[in-house]
A protein has these predicted regions:
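Nucleotide-activated sugar donor-binding and catalytic core shared by glycosyltransferases
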Residues: 1-232
Length: 232
């Protein structure tokens, strides 16, 4: 038996299982084909001319405000932008209304045929397109982690070569976040100042998280296949 994590290993051991092997968590392995959906040429041109200093991924209410607070403190140049990808995209108009008092120019993705060049925030309001935008950011905040929600899966962000920033509430993906933290791919903050300090320090750092995860996942897949071959 090959439990996916230490917690499952412990439960199975208590139940009397003896032949247990920790081969690694298969959730870390991405066996899906890359999406063939790409940005339109005008959108590609826009993002190449900008620098995404932060992406808020799978955000929940109040977390967009947090991302904007961070963005306004770290932004140095006009071509630096914030990307927001809410967990529930139907909240897009509510988010725009919520941020009105900030006097920032927000562009919705569904209006992206003609992107305003002077925008501050690019807001994704469609499902199934997040991965296309994650690749443009080196630092990604994963939502559901400031509020008591339990966090969101950070692996898509890591696979797009980003460092993950998150709050303390990640119990739904506890082992994955612990693993990423150990590998220095993710960072947990307790308050706004901690998050701000970390981003300022990491803003110009180039860490190949994609390669790190690929190496680890390849090892897990190899060990799992070797173990399965014993029973074929």
């Amino acid at each position: 038996c090959a439990p996916q994590n230490k917690e499952t290993h412990s439960y199975l051991k208590k139940l009397g299982s003896k032949k247990l092997k920790n081969l690694g968590n298969l959730k870390l392995c991405d066996t899906k084909q890359k999406s063939l959906i790409k940005l339109k040429s005008s959108q590609k041109k826009f993002f190449k001319s900008k620098k995404v200093v932060l992406t808020g991924y799978s955000t929940h209410p109040t977390e967009e405000e947090f991302c904007v607070d961070i963005f306004e403190r770290i932004r140095k140049k006009k071509n630096e932008i914030l990307v927001l990808i809410p967990r529930h995209v139907e909240r897009a108009n509510a988010i725009i209304n919520q941020l009105k008092h900030r006097n920032l120019i927000i562009q919705k993705h569904t209006l992206g045929n003609k992107i305003q060049n002077n925008i501050d925030i690019y807001l994704i309001d469609t499902y199934g397109e997040a991965k296309k935008f994650l690749r443009y950011s080196k630092i990604i905040f994963t939502g559901g982690s400031i509020i008591p929600h339990g966090g969101q899966n950070p692996l898509d962000a890591v696979r797009e070569n980003a460092i993950v920033l998150h709050g303390p509430n990640v119990q739904n993906f506890k082992e994955i976040y612990a693993f990423l933290s150990k590998e220095k791919i993710s960072y947990q903050f307790r308050n706004f100042n901690q998050a701000l300090k970390y981003i300022k320090n990491k803003k110009s750092v180039n860490i190949n998280t994609k390669l790190k995860l690929k190496t680890i996942s390849s090892k897990i897949l190899k060990n799992t296949k070797l173990e399965l071959m014993k029973y074929v």
